[in-house]
C-alpha cells in the first residue's frame, strides 16, 4: 500500500505519523490551499458573533482565523458547536467548551441530531465557515426557528500543481488516496489528466462522508470507502488498519 495524503499544508501531520508507526509508505501533496478573506476584519460580522446565542464552527480553519480577531474565550453567553472532532479540540485548545457532532457522524447532518439544536425559536446563530460552503445547516436551523448569519473567514483554492505530479504518483505506486472534503476531491479530478483516469479508478479512495462518496462515484471512481469522519482515526480505520 502507498498512500497519498492531500489535505492543506500543515494538516497532514497526524496521518503521516500514524502511517509511519504502521510502516506504511506515503506521499504528501496538498490539494487544497486556505486563504483568509477580508471578512476576518468585518466589524459587522464580528458584532454578530459577539451578540450570538450560538456560534457554530465548521472547521479548524474557521476557529484559527476567527480567534485572531475575536476573543472567543471571553464570550460570556454563546454556546459553541464544532462539526468535527478536530474542530472541537481546536476550540478546546483555546479554553473554549463546545458541543460536537456524534463521534460516528461527524458531519453537518450529525450536528443537527443534537438535542440542543432542535428547538431554536428566537435564537441568533452565527456559522463560521469558508466561502461557498453547503447551505443544509443554515436552512435546517432556520426551519427550527433560528436567525442565521455567516462569517466566512477563509476561502479554499486549488494550489498550483506541477503537471508532472500525477504521473509521479502513478510511478511511485500510489494505490490509496485520502480525501477529506469535496473540494479536495474536485481538485484531484481537475489535475489528473484523462490518460491517467484508468489508474485513478484502480486507487482506493477514502472519503469523509456519504455525500463525498456519492460525488466520487459520480466521477467514475470505483473503489470508494466512507470513513464517516475526516479525522485521522476514522481514516486509518477505513483503511482496515489499527493505530
Regions found by a protein language model. Give the residues of each.
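Signature of uroporphyrinogen-III synthase
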Residues: 1-243
Amino acid at each position: 500500500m502507498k498512500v497519498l495524503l492531500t489535505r492543506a499544508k500543515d494538516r497532514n501531520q497526524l496521518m503521516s505519523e500514524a502511517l509511519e508507526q504502521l510502516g506504511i509508505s506515503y506521499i504528501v501533496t496538498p490539494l487544497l490551499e486556505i486563504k483568509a478573506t477580508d471578512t476576518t476584519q468585518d466589524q459587522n460580522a464580528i458584532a454578530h458573533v459577539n451578540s450570538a446565542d450560538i456560534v457554530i464552527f465548521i472547521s479548524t480553519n474557521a476557529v484559527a482565523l476567527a480567534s485572531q480577531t475575536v476573543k472567543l474565550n471571553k464570550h460570556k453567553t454563546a454556546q459553541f458547536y464544532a462539526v468535527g472532532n478536530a474542530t472541537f479540540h481546536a476550540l478546546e485548545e483555546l479554553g473554549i467548551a463546545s458541543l460536537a457532532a456524534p463521534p460516528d457522524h461527524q458531519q453537518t447532518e450529525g450536528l443537527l441530531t443534537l438535542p440542543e439544536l432542535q428547538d431554536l425559536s428566537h435564537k441568533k446563530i452565527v456559522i463560521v465557515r469558508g466561502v461557498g460552503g453547503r447551505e443544509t445547516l443554515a436552512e435546517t436551523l432556520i426551519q427550527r426557528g433560528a436567525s442565521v448569519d455567516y462569517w466566512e473567514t477563509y476561502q479554499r483554492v486549488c494550489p498550483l500543481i506541477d503537471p508532472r505530479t500525477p504521473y509521479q504518483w502513478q510511478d511511485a505506486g500510489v494505490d490509496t488516496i485520502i480525501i477529506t472534503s469535496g473540494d479536495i476531491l474536485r481538485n484531484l479530478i481537475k489535475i489528473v489528466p484523462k490518460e491517467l483516469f484508468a489508474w485513478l479508478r484502480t486507487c482506493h479512495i477514502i472519503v469523509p462522508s456519504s455525500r463525498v462518496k456519492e460525488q466520487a462515484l459520480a466521477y467514475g471512481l470505483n473503489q470508494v470507502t466512507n470513513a464517516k469522519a475526516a479525522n485521522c482515526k476514522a481514516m486509518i480505520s477505513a483503511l482496515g488498519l489499527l493505530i
